[in-house]
A protein has these predicted regions:
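A short alpha-helical cap/connector motif
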Residues: 1-148
Length: 148
């Protein structure tokens, strides 16, 4: 799918109330109540990642309730998950379990504080889809945009 079609599909899903088909999707049922993102966010990202040239970076993957639906049945050129799970003991194992359960194995996992990674680590990749779900302070939100 080209970028304009993927974006159009994602925006349509985000605006419409018609998410019933996706509500019964086993993937969404599996994460119901376990993550902090809503179903529309998950569908929006999933539609964006249907773009055949998608290069996705998600910071703050926690249990995978956003990351896994984003990648589900998609084949992005690049996919990176960044989390150090410093505020969530035991969640890394749950994230990896969810990835295995849903057959996701084509992604890169960086287990570090995002702000402690060098932007040069990512400079060779031109990410075109970026979801930051790390620390939620206003300052962190700005830092997340500037860090890349």
């Amino acid at each position: 799918m080209d970028l304009s079609k993927a974006l159009s599909s994602a925006l349509t899903c985000a605006k419409e109330e018609d998410t019933r088909d996706s509500l019964n999707n086993p993937l969404n049922l599996a994460f119901k109540g376990t993550g902090l993102s809503g179903i529309k966010t998950r569908i929006f990202l999933n539609k964006l990642l249907s773009y055949e040239e998608a290069r996705y970076l998600e910071v703050g993957v926690f249990r995978g309730a956003t990351f896994i639906p984003a990648l589900f049945e998609n084949n992005p050129k690049e996919a990176y998950a960044v989390d150090n799970w410093s505020e969530a003991g035991g969640q890394k194992e749950l994230f990896l379990h969810h990835c295995r359960y849903f057959g996701l194995n084509k992604f890169n996992l960086i287990e570090k504080d995002f702000f402690q990674t060098s932007a040069a680590s990512y400079s060779w990749i031109k990410f075109n889809i970026y979801f930051y779900d790390g620390h939620h302070s206003e300052e962190s939100q700005y830092k997340a945009l500037e860090h890349l």
